Amino acid sequence: MTQQGPAEFTPPPECPVFEPSWEEFKDPFAFINKIRPIAEKTGICKVRPPPDWQPPFACDVDRLHFTPRIQRLNELEAQTRVKLNFLDQIAKFWDLQGCTLKIPHVERKILDLYQLNKLVADEGGFDLVCRERRWTKIAMTMGFAPGKAVGSHLRAHYERILYPYNLFQSGTNLLCLQKPGDEVNDIDKEYKPHDLLQRQNVPLQPSNTSAPARRAKRMKTESGCIKSEEGEGVENKPNLRRRMGSFVVKTEPKKEIPIQVKEEPVEIKELNPEPEKSKPKKKNIPPPPVSMVDLYVCLVCGKGNDEDRLLLCDGCDDSYHTFCLIPPLTDVPKGDWRCPKCLTQECCKPQEAFGFEQAHRDYTLKAFGEMADSFKSDYFNMPVHMVPTELVEKEFWRLVGTIQEDVTVEYGADIASKEFGSGFPIKGGRFKIAPHDEKYLQCGWNLNNMAMMTPSVLTHVTADICGMTLPWLYVGMCFSSFCWHIEDHWSYSINYLHWGEPKTWYGAPGFAAEQLEAVMKKLAPELFDSQPDLLHQLVTIMNPNTLMAHGVPIYRTNQCAGEFVITFPRSYHSGFNQGFNFAEAVNFCTVDWMPLGRQCVDHYRQLHRYCVFSHDEMVCNMAMKADCLDVVLASAVQKDMQLMIKEERELREKVRKMGVAQCELFQYDLLADDERQCVKCRTTCYLSALTCPCRPGVQVCLYHTHDLCSCPISNYTLNYRFTLDDLYPMMNAVRQRAEYYDDWASRVTEVMEAKLDKKRNVTVFRTLLEESNEQSFPENDLLRQLRLVTQDAEKCSSVAQQLLNGKRQTRYRTGKAKSPNQLTVEEMRSFVRQLYNLPCSLTQAPLLKELLNSIEDFQQHSEKLLSDEVSADAVSEIESLLEEGSQFDVFLPELPLLRERLEQARWLTGVHQAEDPVANPCGLSLESMRRLIDRGVGLTPHPSIERMMARLQELLTVSEELEENAQALLKARPPESLETLCSMLTQVEGVPAYLPNCLLLQDTVNRAKEWLQEAESLQVGGQVPVFSSLSDMVLRAHSIPVRLEPLDQLEVQVSEVQSWKETAAKTFLIKSSPFTLLEVLCPRWEMGSSLKKKKMRKMKGDCVSSGKKKFVKLDSMSDVERALSDSKDSASAMFTLAEVRLKELESLCSLRASNESKLLPTADCASLKVCVCQKPAMGAMLQCELCRDAFHSVCVRGPSDPLDPEAWLCPLCLRSTKPPLDKIRSLLSSLQRIRVRLPEGDALRYMIERSVSWQRRVREVIDSYGLSSTSQDGRGASPSQNLYRSTGHSRKLQLCGSPSRCQDWAVSGQEQTVFYTEQRCIPLQGLSPELEELMVEGLVLQVSLPETQQLYRLLLSGPPTTNTSHAEHKSYLTPPQTETDAITSAEKKAKRRMNRDEVDIRERGTKLKSKKQRMMGVEKRRERKAASVSASDMSQSEDSEEDMTLCPAESCLQPEGEEVDWVQCDCCNRWFHMICVGVSAELAAEEDYMCVSCSTSHMDRRK
């Protein structure tokens, strides 16, 4: 690591840039006053005129010529100049010793001797550093890497070069010094002095190109040739050429000044002793006379011997032996040698002030531009317009901070515009202005006009001040700079860049002026020791980064062509030019400057700096014109005059007391400024001064009375311009002029400065503002402040009222973002403070303060609640807080947090409610947990929420796992054992959740346990189980997803019972029988019409359901079945069936009597309804032997063999196939092996017992009557005759009365009552009740017994009788005794004719029905179909009832379902599907329907 170089420059922040409108641009002073509050905070600002404002360049370019100043960049910077001065002193010190200073290299870099010397001094000096071995620390401080023994090298260099100089400065005798060139490496470079001491404080000789200087000039000039390397001309060194500020012709080589090349270290060669020195260091004296020997003696030893070793001082000619010096010199020095006394004299000479030197060449504007452009393009090796401003800025500050590179430039500064013309057009000037540019002549932004405009107080300065009231011109080149300075008299300045490359500015605000001065004095005290007013000389610059590092606020800007830069009072500013350009500047002073102007004069007096004009003279001139002054200016003048008169009165009183008695009126305004300066402080005298006759033309101000001369003060004369009596009227005149304004201003000031309860209402401020407008008071700070305060107060009042009335909502918002129009609480707090800080009082302020207190209370309550744990009980409290917070029209950051907390609390409430056993007895369900977790995920994280979420998640995971396991167990195939399920339930215990599958599993286990207990009770009890219970257990077992061990055995028993029932059903039931097996086996419960209706309804239902079997359980039969199932044993079941038997016989008796009675001749034959069709009897009829009802032969199937004497039973009475008894007994025995009780088994057992009992009784009856099947051969009395006779009375079967009555009825009924029976029936007349009961019970039995047929045949063959009526009746009821196939074709035709007549009668009868009666429901129509089958339909095969399920339509669509609609043909009474015949429900309800067949037949009959 090597020594640290200067840090890269960091540009300061930009200053304000203003772009006024045309309206604002019209009045420059009004605009400057407007921007002053902003711009004075940065010291400088930039103003861009409107784009169309482009004044012509009016300067006479051909006549303009100037001599620029030479600027060596590294001499400008204060700290760099200090280093150079130090090196020059070291070089001079060794040069006087006859030695040449060579700067050593360390780590391949030139050693910074200044820094090394300063660090050693700061550490306590050479001896202390050596004693405490601090050289390594110093090396590290200088930026060298540790561990390379750099410290020892630094010590050697310090001891050899700097230590002797420091000893000399401390006053130690240096008679013997080691030469700095001894024991040095060849790589050490010789130091060439910068000749700063030779270029100090040149006498003020005004050149012909500038006005009398008002800033420090250089005191002398020298041949300013720029030196190139020896033996080479400037023309042959391009690198050197681009570092030169001008092309100066080389003069004498001995006067050349070395220049450092940029890329390389200094090429310094050891200088040879000057050849022109004729006096040798060794004094070769010819043998003198004896009397002259004593003249050349050594001042140390006092002897004159060893003349060849005697040295003669080149300064004082004193002699010293080389061996007398300590330590002795081995050789005679080759160069000049000074003795210690002369060395002290030379080195102790005071350092003269630094100043710029003038170049030796006079430039025209063209020539300077060529030189400037050539320099910049050569330096950056690119065209001038392509060099970035940032690069130039960084390179400039690098160059001013280095001592290794010497770059010289030239700057045409302070060129008087009065001689060569301004860049702006002037009236009467040589530049001819175009007509369209004449507006620029009177423009306020024309710098020739600005300083002398009415708002500028400089108009009252009588003399023309070049640079202040008259513009100065500036011609710059790249790197040419203007150093840190403030304007004369701390005035404003304005600079306009007419054309060229930008000018970079740096500025510090006026309040930081003293801070900047203190920093510069601190960092470069050596410069200020010799030049206290250094900053007034414009010769010193300092890096802005350095100033900013010490707390000085610095701002920058780049001024481009056509832009103004304004500097404000006492604002330090500096800068440099980016390239060739032309600028113009002037000063001006406004009313607000006047207090600063007087302070500046006092400041100048302390620094002994001359004034550019007399401030007191300017004030008095304005006071003399009081009637013409602006009221604001008059007020300012009055205040300034008051201070001035007070000060002058005190000074004159002081002088009078000191003894000055002579007074004399003196017209100081007739003298030039340089002729009336104080000889001490150089202040321009005006009001008064002291003179003495001993020094004519010399005066002092009243502050420096003792500095005039040594004469007694009584000899002094007080010269005065005005008496005090003259000054007071002048001040009063100004006061009267400003009195009204002052009164207004005082009132404004009073209300503006009122405190607390003394503040006035805003209406007072409005009144004052209106008054200023009425009186046309000029724009000034006070008026602007009043206007600003009034505007602020009105705005604050409006905002405060809005906040007070700002309840813009009744419910709190859901959004979290801040409304653009809402204030934050801190902003509202600041706003309230602003209200109370306003100079005026607002009625809304206390109300808003109260509102703010409420808001703060709300915030405190909210913060306390938010700091607590999330609680479900806090929902109502949070809601009330949110409701309260929503009333404030302020952005409250607690509101979104409260909303989040509310959601959290509600969520916790939901969790607690879900877990509450009272509110939710079932427990927390999985869906509730998932829903709560989903809601919880969207909540703002909180420890309470996180804990509850973790608990819910854990519970959900466990619950889901248990549910899955429970579901797997419930769906397991084959099912799991009960033990597995119970072990699973032990895991569920203690889980606070509603688990449906687990509950189902629990229910399954409970049901399984109950089932096993029931199964165990069935097996252990010893009694035969009931089939219903057994079947129910099997069904329940199938619904229990558990492996049940007894189930297999029960299923086998149930299967056996089902097989038995199927066998029994096949044995008993007729095909398509409407009766169940139990109904067949049990005694009959219902008889007659009710059973008939139910049977027909059942048959119709079978038709509608397309043949699907549906066994309708009768209520009474259900009771029987329930009683049988509930019976505990067979005995109780037999008792129940015995009761049903008695009911059966009783019902049959009633039914038979009813049916017999309606067939008696006395009956109303017109209303007689018989058969399954419930129509009148007609034609061939069949009479059931059991129920004794009559049936049309066409409606039911008759006996298969009419000649075979077999009892015919109607379809309602024929309930089963009546299997033989042996077959039934086998069924019963097979059932007993199964050991299961079922109602069918009990009924079968009872049937068998009943059948056996009946057989026994029949046999007893037959035996008791002596009947035998072999006595029926016709010999003797027939068994039936004996049976009939034994009854003791006779009964005659008469159907429908006597023949005569039947004939009448037949006639009246149009022969519809003519009917007869086709088979022989048992005559009931004379039949004993016992035999009838036996016969009825035998027919009721569903068992085929030979006794039944035997008894029937015996009862059927009764004795012949000669009774006429009976014979007639028999002839009427019974057809002729012929064979079965003896039915003639006539009888068949008669039957068909009768059928057709019935159809006609039915058609006529149905036409009388209402339309509502014609359209019946599906169930009613099914009954009508079963009861209204026509003879033609029933004449077909009645063997199958399945025909009733078919639609007669040719293309039947075969629809299915309970909702299929039917329609009946009104002719043939056949039923059709509505969809098959294309009839809608509405059409069928309103119109008669006739099928296609009937329609065709009907039309044929009509034909």
UniProtKB/Swiss-Prot annotation:
Residues recorded as binding Fe cation, renumbered to this chain, are 485, 488, 573
- Family to which the UniProt record says this protein belongs: Belongs to the JARID1 histone demethylase family.
- Database matches in SMART domains: ARID, BRIGHT, JmjC, JmjN, PHD
Q: How and how many cofactors are bound, per the record note? A: Binds 1 Fe(2+) ion per subunit.
Domain JmjN: where? 15-56
| PROSITE patterns associated with the record | ARID, JMJC, JMJN, ZF_PHD_1, ZF_PHD_2
**Domain topic, free-text comment:** Both the JmjC domain and the JmjN domain are required for enzymatic activity.
Molecular function per GO: DNA binding; histone H3K4me/H3K4me2/H3K4me3 demethylase activity; zinc ion binding
Residue ranges annotated as compositionally biased, kind Basic and acidic residues, are 268-278
Location in or out of the cell: Nucleus
- Give the PHD-type zinc finger regions: 295-345, 1168-1216, 1444-1497
**Which EC number applies?**
1.14.11.67
Native organism is Danio rerio (Zebrafish)
Q: Which cofactor does it need?
A: Fe(2+)
* Bias-annotated ranges (Polar residues): 202-211
**Positions of the UniProt region annotated as Disordered:** 202-223, 268-287, 1362-1381, 1403-1442
What protein does this entry describe?
Answer: Lysine-specific demethylase 5B-B
Q: Which UniProt keywords apply?
A: Chromatin regulator, Dioxygenase, Iron, Metal-binding, Nucleus, Oxidoreductase, Repeat, Transcription, Transcription regulation, Zinc, Zinc-finger
Q: What would be one Gene Ontology cellular-component term for the protein?
A: nucleus
Return the Gene3D superfamilies for the record: ARID DNA-binding domain, Cupin, Zinc/RING finger domain, C3HC4 (zinc finger)
